[in-house]
Amino acid sequence: MAADGFRVLVCGGRDYADRDRVFAELDALQPIRMVIHGNARGADALAHQWCLSRRVQAAPCPAKWAKYGKRAGPMRNEAMLGHSPDLVLAFPGGRGTADMMSRARKAGVRVVEVATLRALMGKEGSDADPSV
């Protein structure tokens, strides 16, 4: 961590909607000087809202889907690592989130996975019972 705070990379699913959890996890990591995210809806958008509410610098890294097609996601993940995060805060997500966590670990960046009750119960995924 730099003297003036952490550089935190946030990743997670586009359908992740637990604003309170995102805010609580980021609040617990103080001091934060920058939040790096992929500029997608879901976890990324919630992290950006946190930045605005706390007056913390955001570093959005949007994927260039139109230009690069399927390669855009992994390219965006590499670009986010280029911001030299101190840690990755990973909320539940899919392949893109898994790719980001894998790349971060290979780069020696600490990854903190934020579990949900559904994930802890083994019900994460498309065939999960929505009543849980």
Where in this protein do the model-derived segments appear?
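Glycine-rich, aromatic-bearing surface loops/beta-hairpins
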Residues: 131-132
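Acidic/glycine-enriched connector segments
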Residues: 2-8, 15-127
